[in-house]
Amino acid sequence: MTLVAGSATAGYGRVPAAPAQPPQTIVFPVLGPVEYIDDFGAPRPGGPHQGIDILAPKRALALAAEAGKIKFWTSSATAGCMLYLYGASGTTYYYIHLNNDLTAKNDNKGKCVAGTAYAKGLKNGAKVAAGQVLGYVGNSGDADGGPTHLHFELHPNGGKGVDAYPWLQSGQHLLFASGRGTAFTLDLRGTVSAVTADTLRIKAASVTAWPMRQGQPLSLKVLVNVPSSAIVQTVKGMGKPGTPADLLDAKPGQKVQVWTGAAPTTLKAERGGALNASLVSLLGR
């Protein structure tokens, strides 16, 4: 039999398609400070641990690891308030033990609904963007009474779960999370790392995003464009009146506060890219 390329019948001679793989880099699924170890496969009463527990404050924002479609799961006494993210790569992600409290206490008075467990306004079956807020960290299900955390699982091609630790280690931590296109302003504080006539690289120690009021400590180098319209000043204390300064006067290691100009939210901006300063305050030395 002679096979003509592209004309195989009933699959004869076809090369099976390679199984879908997770993206090399995912958005880290929790915003802000976290603690976690590689506890995948660790002994548990119900069998080996199938995910990674990411410890985070109550109601910390759980974020979409990649773009995809979500499904609420509310009927598991073990998982509590849970969500599936069916990623565009073919990977399925599990978000387990989301919040079910209505107060700062462990009251268990909330339901697995948008605004309590899931992001406000999020609908079951919705398509989501990478980095979009999906829900809130909690301790529902059999995690009740324990430390608040996100039990995170990664299932390539929707199959058996694998150790998500390598993806978390290389995951992209966001500076903030907001709806695409909504206006934001950042208050970045840290020290000068490098400077040119129109850019400032800082070693950021903290960031606060407005008007979302999302603040977190950082240890991250961030490059900020400084257009000619930006105000550059020297101050004797952060928040105090300043005197005009030249950006090139900034010295490595000098303390600095940068306010970015109001801009529409994009994933690139959430990652710390395409930021433009409106005010640069250099602490006098």
PLM features: residue spans?
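Secretory targeting and sorting signals
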Residues: 1-12
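Surface-exposed, glycine-biased beta-strand/turn segments
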Residues: 10-91, 100-101, 129-130, 139, ...
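Active-site region of chymotrypsin-like
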Residues: 49-52, 87-124
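Beta-strand/loop nucleic-acid-binding surfaces
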Residues: 95-104, 215-244
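Short nucleic-acid-contacting surface segments enriched for D/E, G, S/T with interspersed K/R
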Residues: 118-127, 237-258
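Flexible glycine-rich surface loops and low-complexity tracts that mediate binding to linear polymers
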Residues: 136, 248-275
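A short hydrophobic beta-strand segment most commonly corresponding to one strand
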Residues: 149-158
